[in-house]
């Protein structure tokens, strides 16, 4: 009994602590909106858990899937399929909403209707999309929204990170207003799914990419909730903007999609905004930064695939109900727009897929900044004093704040005051392409890189397998310098990998590729993606993610008693080598005093030296 009293007391204490954490959050703005009419009445047999609880809670995995299975069984418009299993054995389900009788991938594509693929719960604490999708699919099946499927097919993944969804707690996201039970950011392997699109380590992202390959959606939506600053917007969303490899799609998202969605959201009482990342994390007046991350991110990956991609970031400080309803409106608005504009978007997409740049940028830079920035490194960067052009401006619907000095840490921190204000701020954009790589005809990959080949296949990249050895004239990279660690050279693992960066020197050579090698032509829609994954200087290449660490290991060597007389003989036989040796010692004093380095240098000049040492094994056919 004492143990039971302690348990109950502990629960009450934890609930009180959770409530106290919520009370520390900035003041909440009162909200009423037309979209509240979408909330089911209490007597509706298909009312969701979120609606029933007044948007205090969200259903767990079992309850969610049980509800969906009943809904699907009752409606001829809905089909439910498992697209994969998590490492803990949970099915990752996708709901297909279509007026077509046959909902196979081939049949849906043959129907000619544009396909919207939307996913929720890639970060399962940010679960608004799941509850919004439940409500919308309910209204499509049994409400007044059936007509949404007249000209569009809708694929919906309610929970992508299913294991993390069950790692639920009221303490997972202290800077977010509801629901009371929130899932975890990373999956059961502690991997962030929204850093996995390029390397595809996880079953969850492999499942999503398989859906992309099979169904070929015309638009892809990834629904999140922010971490960060306060402002008036309850929903922010958009594509990459002008930065990226799909200019036609970018233009459509900016000039057609965003205005239409903004109009519908505003009409329903919401305040939509563009994607926001503060340049200074305690002072938004310093500006906003929009950058293109690599294809590790969902929206950047979609851009590399030439697939219109929308990143949704609901505002964490707005109440759960308001965020869910905003997501409902956005999903419905997207379906309506695709019904009239989906054909045009398909044509634009095909044009982007046909682009074959002679030189492909591996990154995008903010012209007004000296430093490279990305989503994970954008706060407090330095602005260039010699900027080529002034940045755009943005009328930010912000919240008044003040900077306080902490009595605990003695550092400055921001306090949001809950008062709406409008600020005109600079809006920095990563629109300058950089780190260009000349497009090769294709890449040759030996069978020893079978893991890389398998991952490229999973991406849907087309390749040819050779059954006989083939000698090919190729360009190959020799790694001349390399550093382990992230962009700041911090030697620590990131997303299950030890990252590496290096400089390369190109070597033209005839290389024998064994049977089982593959050839990947860059003359294909996913040619740019292949380049970003295979070029070592790309931050999201398999080289950079540490898949080729074995090339940094030397496995054969020569003893000094062999190398010393050989080096002496080499100098006697070649005055040119003697001159090169003297110049090397004069230029590198550390080398001149290091006997091992000297003998290694001579060893590298012999035919005994391992030619594969520091040689990146992928060949470029020019």
Where are these regions (language model features)?
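Bacterial Sec-dependent N-terminal signal peptides
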Residues: 1-27
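Acidic/histidine-rich, surface-exposed loop or edge segments in extracytoplasmic proteins
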Residues: 37-56, 118-120, 191-192, 432-439
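Second-shell loop/turn segments in exported
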Residues: 50-58, 122-126, 194-198, 247-251, ...
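Soluble metallo-hydrolase cores and metallopeptidase-like ectodomains found primarily
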Residues: 62-116
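Active-site/substrate-binding loop(s) of hydrolase catalytic cores
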Residues: 110-119, 127-284, 290-296
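Hard-cation-handling environments
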Residues: 278-474, 478-481
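Substrate-recognition/cap regions that form aromatic- and gly/pro-loop-enriched pockets
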Residues: 431-436, 444, 451-524, 528, ...
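Accessory, solvent-exposed terminal regions and/or long lumenal/extracellular loops of proteins
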Residues: 526-529, 534-622
């Amino acid at each position: 009994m004492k143990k039971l009293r302690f348990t109950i007391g502990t629960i009450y204490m934890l609930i009180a602590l959770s409530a106290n954490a919520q009370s520390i959050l900035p003041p909440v703005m009162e909200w009423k909106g037309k979209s509240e009419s979408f909330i089911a009445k209490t007597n509706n047999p298909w009312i969701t858990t979120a609606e029933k609880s007044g948007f205090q809670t969200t259903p767990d995995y079992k309850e969610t899937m049980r509800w969906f299975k009943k809904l699907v069984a009752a409606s001829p418009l809905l089909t439910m399929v498992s697209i994969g299993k998590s490492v803990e054995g949970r099915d990752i389900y996708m709901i297909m909403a279509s007026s077509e009788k046959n909902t196979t991938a081939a049949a849906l594509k043959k129907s000619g209707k544009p396909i919207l693929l939307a996913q929720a719960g890639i970060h399962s604490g940010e679960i608004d999309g799941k509850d919004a999708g439940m409500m919308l699919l309910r209204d499509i099946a049994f409400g007044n929204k059936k007509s949404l499927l007249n000209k569009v097919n809708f694929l919906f993944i309610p929970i992508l990170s299913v294991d993390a969804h069950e790692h639920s707690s009221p303490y997972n996201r202290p800077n977010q207003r509801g629901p009371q039970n929130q899932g975890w950011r990373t999956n059961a392997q502690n991997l962030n799914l929204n850093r996995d699109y390029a390397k595809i380590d996880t079953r969850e992202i492999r499942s999503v990419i398989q859906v992309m390959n099979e169904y070929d959606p015309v638009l892809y939506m990834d629904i999140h909730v922010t971490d960060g600053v306060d402002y008036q917007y309850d929903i922010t969303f958009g594509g990459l903007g002008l930065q990226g490899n799909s200019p036609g799609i970018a233009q459509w998202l900016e000039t057609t999609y965003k205005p239409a969605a903004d109009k519908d959201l505003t009409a329903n009482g919401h305040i939509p905004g563009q994607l926001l990342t503060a340049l200074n994390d305690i002072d938004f007046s310093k500006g906003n930064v929009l950058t293109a991350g690599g294809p590790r991110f969902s929206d950047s990956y979609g851009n590399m695939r030439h697939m219109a991609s929308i990143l949704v970031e609901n505002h964490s400080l707005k109440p759960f109900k308001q965020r869910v309803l905003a997501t409902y409106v956005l999903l419905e608005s997207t379906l309506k727009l695709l019904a009239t504009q989906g054909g045009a978007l398909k044509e634009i997409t095909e044009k982007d897929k046909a682009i074959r740049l002679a030189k492909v940028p591996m990154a995008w830079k903010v012209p007004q900044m000296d430093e490279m920035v990305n989503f994970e490194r954008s706060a407090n960067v330095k602005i260039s004093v010699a900027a080529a052009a002034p940045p755009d401006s943005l009328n930010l619907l912000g919240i008044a704040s003040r900077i306080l000095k902490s009595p605990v840490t003695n550092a400055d921190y921001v306090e949001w005051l809950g008062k709406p204000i409008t600020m005109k701020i600079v809006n920095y954009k990563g629109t300058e392409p950089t780190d260009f790589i000349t497009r090769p005809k294709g890449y040759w990959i030996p069978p020893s890189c079978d893991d890389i080949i398998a991952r490229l296949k999973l991406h849907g990249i087309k390749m040819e397998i050779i059954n006989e050895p083939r000698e090919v004239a190729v360009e190959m990279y020799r790694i001349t310098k390399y550093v382990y660690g992230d962009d700041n050279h911090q030697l620590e693992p990131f997303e299950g990998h030890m990252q590496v960066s290096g400089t390369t020197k190109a070597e033209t050579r005839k290389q024998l590729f064994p049977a089982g090698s593959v050839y990947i032509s860059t003359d294909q829609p996913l040619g740019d993606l292949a380049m970003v994954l295979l070029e070592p200087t790309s931050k999201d290449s398999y080289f950079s993610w540490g898949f080729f660490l074995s090339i940094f290991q030397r496995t054969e060597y020569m003893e000094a008693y062999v190398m010393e007389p050989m080096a002496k003989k080499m100098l006697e036989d070649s005055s040119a080598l003697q001159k090169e040796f003297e110049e090397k010692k004069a230029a590198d004093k550390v080398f001149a005093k290091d006997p091992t380095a000297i003998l290694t240098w001579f060893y590298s000049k012999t035919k005994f030296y391992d030619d594969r040492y520091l040689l990146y094994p992928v060949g470029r056919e020019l």
